[in-house]
From Swiss-Prot:
Keywords: Cell cycle, Cell division, DNA-binding
Family: Belongs to the WhiA family.
Main function: Involved in cell division and chromosome segregation.
Organism of derivation: Caldicellulosiruptor bescii (strain ATCC BAA-1888 / DSM 6725 / KCTC 15123 / Z-1320)
GO MF: DNA binding
GO terms (BP aspect): cell division; regulation of sporulation
DNA-binding region(s), chain positions: 280-313
Keyword DNA-binding: yes
Gene3D superfamilies: Homing endonucleases
InterPro entries with a match to the protein in the record: Homing_endonucl (IPR027434), Sporu_reg_WhiA_N_dom (IPR018478), Sporulation_regulator_WhiA (IPR003802), Sporulation_regulator_WhiA_C (IPR023054), WhiA_LAGLIDADG_dom (IPR039518)
Record-given protein name: Probable cell division protein WhiA
Length: 325
């Protein structure tokens, strides 16, 4: 089972059954997975789910929260023959108007009620109701990409109004969700791993939260190791390139004016550099008659580089034997 499916199975078991929260959750389920039908003053609705536990949660929500007994049908997914689609249907009845009134999906006209299938602020005034709304929204149209690959949580909704309503609910929990239009739908998404962890905490998916945190820790450790290896490799390459440059410059000086014409202090380090090509700067410094640290050795070698550069330009180097740096 995918990470997203596992998280949904966990949330399905924790869907709130409180009356106010039940209204917020039912509204999200119907809005994002269902359709409402109106015929001769009667109303019915149908929702479809690919997750059996989510379908069961909605069925129980209607039964316990609204005293409605829905019909359930199961058939194979036409696109994915291995999966099933669970359809929950509430048959037409004038009594169903009460449910839709609770969900603010109908408005009263001069003589009768009319369908108004849009989400209302009244549903999510309380924090507990906003949590229930997010639980049902995640179960209905949410998905989380495999965190081993990337951090991405998204909700696929039909209209811009739905996307902005969801964005506003997420904003109440300090989530800065983005909206992007994708073909005929709108996608509300979060990309930061720590924010997805916070979202899982809010909807009660604590086991999935811990799994994601473990994945994040391993990925961060792996990235740190790779960064360290890359840094060490870069430093090693830099050291090797510098050593090769020094040797090349010293050999050039030997062919032109001769190492013996360098100041005494530079002669000493030049001969050691040629003799011990693989030695580090620290090792070279310890070999000197008067030992030097890495920075002192590097300073002398840079002087040799400068002399070689002047010689290549055709300049004249007046070497003065010296023990000074």
């Amino acid at each position: 089972m995918s990470f997203s499916s596992t998280a949904k199975a966990e949330v399905s078991k924790k869907l709130s059954q409180n009356s106010c929260c039940a209204r917020a959750a039912a509204a999200a389920f119907l809005k994002f997975t269902g359709n409402i039908y109106e015929l001769d003053g009667t109303f019915s609705f149908k929702t479809s789910f690919e997750n059996a536990q989510t379908a069961r949660s909605f069925f129980l929500l209607m039964k316990n929260g609204f005293s409605k007994h829905c019909e359930v049908s199961i058939k194979k997914n036409s696109k994915l023959q291995k999966n099933y689609v669970y359809t929950i249907f509430l048959p037409p009845s004038s009594d169903n108007i009460g449910v839709l009134k609770d969900l603010h999906f109908v408005r009263k006209g001069a003589k009768e009620y009319h369908l108004s299938f849009s989400l209302k602020e009244e549903l999510v005034r309380k924090k507990c109701c906003r949590k229930a709304f997010l639980q049902a929204t995640f179960l209905s149209c949410g998905s989380i990409t495999n965190p081993e690959k990337m951090y991405h949580l998204e909700f696929d909704v039909k209209t811009k109004d739905d996307a902005e309503f969801l964005q506003k609910v997420l904003k109440s929990f300090e989530f800065e969700a983005k909206i992007v239009e994708r073909k005929s739908h709108y996608v509300v998404y979060l990309k930061e791993g720590d924010r997805i962890v916070d979202f899982l905490n809010i909807i009660g998916a604590h086991s999935s939260l811990l799994e994601l945190e473990n994945i994040r820790i391993v990925k961060e450790l792996r990235n740190n190791v790779n960064r360290l290896v890359n840094c060490e490799t870069a430093n090693l390459e830099k050291t090797i390139n510098a050593s090769m440059r020094h040797i090349e410059n010293i050999e050039f000086i030997e062919r032109t004016i001769g190492i013996e014409n360098l100041p005494q202090n530079l002669q000493e380090i030049a001969r050691l550099r040629i003799k011990y090509k693989d030695a580090s700067l620290k090792e070279l410094g310890n070999m000197l008659e008067k030992p030097l640290g890495k920075s002192g050795v590097n300073h002398r070698l840079r002087k040799i580089d400068k002399i070689a550069e002047e010689l290549r330009k055709g300049g004249v180097v007046h070497a003065k034997p010296s023990h000074e740096d």
